[in-house]
Curated annotation (Swiss-Prot):
Enzyme class: transferase
EC number per UniProt: 2.7.1.148
Protein's job: Catalyzes the phosphorylation of the position 2 hydroxy group of 4-diphosphocytidyl-2C-methyl-D-erythritol.
Record field: catalytic activity: 4-CDP-2-C-methyl-D-erythritol + ATP = 4-CDP-2-C-methyl-D-erythritol 2-phosphate + ADP + H(+)
Species the sequence originates in: Francisella tularensis subsp. tularensis (strain WY96-3418)
Protein name: 4-diphosphocytidyl-2-C-methyl-D-erythritol kinase
HAMAP family, per database record: IspE (MF_00061)
Keywords: ATP-binding, Isoprene biosynthesis, Kinase, Nucleotide-binding, Transferase
Active-site residues per Swiss-Prot or TrEMBL entry: K14, D140
Associated pathway: Isoprenoid biosynthesis; isopentenyl diphosphate biosynthesis via DXP pathway; isopentenyl diphosphate from 1-deoxy-D-xylulose 5-phosphate: step 3/6
Keyword Heme in record: no
Binding sites annotated in the UniProt record for ATP: P98, M99, G100, A101, G102, L103, G104, G105, G106, S107, S108
């Protein structure tokens, strides 16, 4: 079995600077508006292509069975869309992005897989040309293929490049795994009814996360704890990760030391580009 030299890729996390949920579509997805930026919190994926015609995926943590794994689904979609047969590859995933946190770890891994496959099999393809394929894998996969901070509409696949002023971000995550489906169907979800202009700057007074009310209703004790911290933590995606942005790294370090609950914490930077 001939093996090609292994190639490593980084797979970055994202945050939603705001997330407005609009109407439900006939395909079951919801239209939305959001502003994505990236974090220097990242997974590492190593791809070793070979002629085995087998797809093997391993990780440093427990991951979904092959048929339910977004990385595997990305490979199959790539095969079907571009008629690339007999893919043989060993993929090793080193996870650092927490799962079920709203940071897009699984979607990011799927996008990285599409890019690795493109680099090996179809290097003439641009990232933008793969966005329609990415959208078929999930609402967040497109932004990771796009690779730049962006305003997003549709289900997240209509993207407009929009930089965000780089800052530090303190992430905190309770030991809670969120069901996205449950949050979308929650009676506590109050959907946004008014579109806002993508030309606006970051405005906390009109830009919020519609899922925060759902989270706070389900986990009122965590909501109370955030109030006690007296800081403007915001939720990314459907949670359960919250973030606080600041240009002052020391301020965030001091706050992190003040947090006495058993929460996972990261101090990271925002990024406008990941490719």
């Amino acid at each position: 079995m001939a093996n090609i030299k292994a190639k490593k890729y980084y797979s970055y996390a994202k945050i939603n600077l705001f997330l407005h949920i609009l109407n439900k579509r006939t395909d079951g997805y919801h239209n939305l508006q959001t502003w994505f930026t990236f974090l220097d919190l990242k997974d590492q994926l190593t791809f070793s292509f070979n002629n085995s015609r087998e797809i093997n995926i391993s990780s440093n943590i427990s991951i979904a069975a092959k048929q339910d794994n977004l990385v595997y689904k990305a490979i199959k979609k790539f095969q079907q869309s571009y008629r690339v047969q007999d893919i043989g590859v060993d993929i090793e995933i080193k996870k650092n992005i927490p799962m079920g946190a709203g940071l897009g770890g699984g979607s990011s891994n799927a996008a990285t897989t599409l890019i690795a496959l493109r680099d090996y099999y179809l290097p003439q393809l641009s990232n933008e040309e793969m966005i329609p394929l990415a959208a078929k894998l999930g609402a967040d996969v497109s932004i990771f293929v796009y690779g730049k901070s962006a305003w997003a509409e549709g289900i997240g696949e209509i993207l407009y490049h929009k930089d965000f002023s780089p800052q530090y971000a303190l992430l905190i995550k309770p030991d809670i795994h969120i069901s996205t489906k449950e949050f979308f169907t929650s009676e506590d979800l109050i959907k946004s009814s008014v579109l806002i202009s993508k030309d606006l700057g970051f405005d906390k007074s009109i830009m919020h996360n519609d899922f925060e009310n759902v989270f706070y209703a389900k986990y009122p004790e965590f909501s109370q704890y955030l109030k006690e911290l007296d800081s403007d933590f915001r939720m990314t995606g459907t949670g359960s990760c919250f973030y606080l942005l600041s240009a002052d790294k020391n301020k965030l370090e001091q706050l992190a030391r003040k947090i006495n609950k058993p929460l996972d914490k990261w101090l990271v930077k925002t990024l406008n580009y990941v490719y």
